[in-house]
Amino acid sequence: HSAEQQLALIGFVGVPVEDRPKSRLAVTDTAADQVRTACVSGWYDDGNFALLHPSSAFATKQWPTENFARTAEYLAEQGIHTVAVASKNEGKVLEDLKRESKVPITTFDDLTLPEITALASKARLFVGNDSGIAHIAAAVGTPTVVIFGSSNRNHWRPWTDAPNEIVFEEFACQPCPGYECKEFGDA
């Protein structure tokens, strides 16, 4: 794992490394209050929602939006509301998700990282692509399902004690750090 490699570097320069703590993030009161205000329907405080992050920095790490829509529909059948986040420049994926889904989904493309941290800390579950948001969810102790595409899942999986599941399909060309798939074309 990347964290183990970084800790090994510290050990290499002579600093004893006896503990390998997992990632942890604190939630600020300010961020929690801002998210609570944005979530007018009350689902934030009762925590009966799943957080989805259906976007990714690279096409090779992107699970199809339709699959996230089916996930939201399944969660709704279980009585769990779906909230999806993305950045401003990823707003199209949120629009596509809402269009593809047969159930209502609350979306945000304007939250700060502290606000996403607060939101993730209240979620019953996180489902998303391999991304920084997946690491945030894991670091606040939220159970995570992380979908890996081209990147090295052993190296980049969330570093957490929280329940987590890594979902992937094995390809002979993995791991691949590419922005685009050179083996299969469109990912």
Name what the model sees in each region.
Residues 1-187:
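Catalytic machinery of carbohydrate-active enzymes
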